[in-house]
Amino acid sequence: MKKLEKHYTVYTIDLLGCGRSDKPYLTYTNYLYVQLLTDFIHDVIGERPDVVTTGNSISFAVLAQNMNPNLLASITAINPPAMNSFDRTPDKYSSVKKALLELPILGTFLYNVRTHESNIRRTLQKTYFSRPQLVSSKMLDAYYEASHMGKSHGKYLMASIEGHYTDNAIGHAVKKLTIPLYIIESRSMTDAVAIADSYAHKNATVETAYISNAGLTPQPVSYTHLRAH
């Protein structure tokens, strides 16, 4: 972030249920995050920002812009998933998974297994970094601490994700975008080119770029370089 802060005013937020934010017991929906993003921009930033998203959070920005056409100046999405992955809706099976994860004992146990230190390390090394040795003990501790803050209440967000409550179709919103949408994908990720092309085919103004030797973790230095060019 220090590289970006030299050239831009940067706001970074932990969304509700994530990181060091509060993790209340509720159903986390896509619309909840759309509204949180909209309110943050109106109440804190006070002007149209360039928004940078990672992974699934592209849906919050795209849908927020769709609901408020003058909200954003541009969207840069880093390693977004395929658009059709957002088309899922809660069904009987996913609702059962959500209910199980919210149970006091069983749900907490399943969450603690998922967020065990060894599983966090494995995920970071295999998915978020192209070179496993870049995963430091300090980084691992930060992820572990954040996932277990609030007596493992992060399980409520995980339950909503597994229940597909955080999903919402974005194809129509991408098609209607009139602001710049930049898609940045890691070349090492499966189907990266196909995913980026799917956004470009939906809206001809979408611009795509690729970063080599990177996993899912955002690369601020590379992003700054791409912005400059």
Region annotations inferred by a language model:
Residues T224-H229:
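Conserved small/polar residues in nucleotide/adenosyl-binding loops
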Residues I58-P69, I75:
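Short glycine-enriched nucleophile-adjacent loop
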Residues F86-T89, N112-K175:
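Conserved alpha/beta-hydrolase catalytic His-Asp/Glu region
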Residues T178, Y182-A214:
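Conserved loop-alpha-helix segment in the C-terminal half of the alpha/beta-hydrolase fold
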Residues M1-T9:
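Short amphipathic alpha-helix adjacent to the substrate-entry channel of hydrolases
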Residues T12-V52, N56:
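Active-site loop/oxyanion-hole signature of alpha/beta-hydrolase fold enzymes
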Residues A214-Y223:
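Catalytic histidine-centered segment of alpha/beta-hydrolase-like enzymes
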Residues N66, T76-L106:
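Flexible "cap/lid" loop of the alpha/beta hydrolase fold
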